[in-house]
């Protein structure tokens, strides 16, 4: 998976032009599943869109990351800053025991529900956790 962060006054509108998603309607701390569309409405790839710290944080598929990033760059709007976070790792911890595993590491997910995103510390390491999946 690759992580791309978008910020700026036109970030919502730019991403709304590339996906069928009400990006402006994604509240702070929330995540939505979406897909990139081509000019005729065909699906190019799927992605996750999160709003955290006032910016859009995208997770795109590893196998198509270069294509997805190029697609974003081709349609990059004025007033939008795009940062590809290649220095960040993504770990998918999935399944019904995932909250228990994180609890053993001191992470309390009580009140943290499906399709939310937030900041947590795991063993003293600052992390961003989404409670999502598809």
Where in the sequence are the language-model features?
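Basic, glycine/lysine-rich polyanion-binding surfaces/domains
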Residues: 1-134
